[in-house]
Amino acid sequence: EAYRKIKRLYWDDEAPYYDEERLKMIDKTVCPIDIVCSHTAPSFCYPQTKEGLDYWLTHDKNLSEDLDNERKVFDNIYSYLKENGFELSKWCYGHFHKHNTEYIDGVKFCLLDMDRGVKLDTECIN
């Protein structure tokens, strides 16, 4: 966290959080959520390890815990959407600077490597 603040890699209010009361305010008949675009994804999505993050982990003693917490937030959001009848079909994320597509429980999870110059409409949305 300190390293990210010094290097201005994060804004103070950037960390995701789970707010079930706000989620309850979403009327799925008016705003049917079927696609999620986020910085990272639930913990059950690729990658499930921190392999390749050694450099960053040595410069930020809180990074490992921060990553775990972020992914737990998205675990909770995913569970809420599924349990409350939202017809989730796609989830796009890019945090890990790699490319991967997988289907989990009927949802297409797309890890987008923006360095490849991907386009959301061709890589994930379609």
Predicted feature locations:
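Active-site-proximal loop/helix segment associated with metal-binding centers of metalloenzymes
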Residues: E1-V73
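Intrinsically disordered, low-complexity regions enriched in small/polar residues
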Residues: K5, D12-D13, D19-E20, Y80, ...
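A structural motif corresponding to the C-terminal end of an alpha-helix
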Residues: K28-P32, N76-W91
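Catalytic metal-binding/acid-base residues of hydrolase active sites
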Residues: A41-S43, C92-K98
